[in-house]
Regions:
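A short glycine-rich, Lys/Arg-flanked "PGG" loop and its adjoining helix->strand segment in the class I
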Residues: 159-174
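Class I SAM-dependent transferase core
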Residues: 22-72
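Class I SAM-dependent methyltransferase SAM/SAH-binding core
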Residues: 77-79, 88-135
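N-terminal auxiliary segments of SAM/dcSAM-dependent transferases
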Residues: 1-34
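Conserved Class I S-adenosyl-L-methionine
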Residues: 226-303
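A short acidic, Gly/Pro-enriched loop at the edge of an enzyme's catalytic core
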Residues: 134-146
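Short, glycine-/aromatic-enriched active-site segment of Class I SAM-dependent methyltransferases
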Residues: 181-205, 217
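Short alpha-helix
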Residues: 205-221
Length: 303
């Protein structure tokens, strides 16, 4: 028997949302100082290949590689499901000419994204709303592409996201996801404990396996499903985060002891350390997922 190690997914839905909001509210300065800049506005990992010259390049390259995978064209309507402060939304509007709607449950991210959109003079092409990507108010068949970059992990029920994506996409519309995936279920008690030490620190309830993702997509009519392990391209970015957290950990401990750093902020640092350990133990991988929508007969799910 595998014990339940995750404390996050035993919370109520509203409590889980509150935890996600608290995570991004309280860790924003860490991301701002150590990870992103005004050009990237990215709270995701970078994709390294022969074209990238450093950390910032890899963050932007992630957008390019995913956009190529989805075949995003000028004038297409894209839902950025879990948009953060708008980094990918802005890139898609500027580099691909897309019309983008970004959604996130985090109100402070919506406010920041709107401010950044105004600064970039992109308000005609990008808009942001506070919403749950598993249960939106958008009309059916209203998007050409649904894009999820390291945001699906926060959903308690990944299948609910795929159900809503199938409803929102026009026939022939494309889904593209970049996400952490567990390598097996179950992993065994010690491995599950290690994995969830990371996930709890990042307000993530659990990860699905590649086969679980495929099964959910198939159930809601997606075809041309492709799932690829691209961990090798993410490793430089993962190593960078590990290096940052390893060397900053003593200061984080002191900050927590002094009451300067919150429980959530300290959990983010611990989670980052456990994430790399779990990777080295082969407990998870980083995957690209893409698929094509075939119908619009998914029931309207908004309550």
């Amino acid at each position: 028997m595998v014990l339940q190690h995750n404390t996050f997914d035993r919370r109520s839905p509203s409590s889980r949302t509150d935890a996600i909001v608290a995570y991004y509210d309280e860790t924003w300065l860490d991301y701002r100082f150590f990870w992103l800049n005004e050009k990237t506005l990215s709270v995701h990992f970078g994709y390294s290949d022969e074209t990238t010259g450093g950390h910032a390049d890899s963050l932007l390259n992630m957008n390019r590689v995913l956009a190529d995978r989805a075949g995003i064209r000028q004038g297409e309507r894209v839902l950025d499901a879990g948009c953060g402060v708008g980094g990918s939304s802005f890139w898609l509007a500027q580099q691909r000419g897309a019309e983008v709607v970004g959604i996130t449950p985090v109100g402070s991210q919506v406010a920041q994204a709107k401010r950044f959109a105004a600064q970039r003079k992109l308000t005609r092409h990008v808009r942001f709303e506070q919403a749950d990507y598993t249960n939106t108010l958008f009309p059916s068949a209203s998007f050409d592409v649904v894009w999820s970059l390291e945001s699906l992990c926060h959903a308690q029920d990944k299948a609910a996201f795929y159900r809503e994506a199938a409803r929102l996409l026009r026939p022939g519309g494309r889904l593209v996801v970049a996400e952490y995936m567990r390598t097996a279920r179950p992993l065994g008690n010690p491995s599950e404990r290690l994995l969830h030490k990371w996930l709890d620190g990042w307000a993530i309830p659990d990860l699905d396996t590649p086969d679980e993702h495929r099964s959910s997509m198939s159930a809601f009519g997606f075809t041309d499903i492709q799932i690829d392990d691209v961990t090798a391209h993410i490793r430089p970015s993962l190593h960078r985060l590990h290096w940052i957290t390893f060397w900053s950990y003593p200061l984080a401990v002191l900050g927590r002891a002094a009451g300067i750093r919150s429980f959530v902020q300290h959990g983010n640092v611990l989670g980052s350390l456990y994430q790399y350990h779990a990777l080295e133990c082969g407990l998870w991988c980083y995957g690209f997922i893409s698929a094509v929508a075939t119908s619009t007969d998914m029931p309207y799910s908004a309550s």
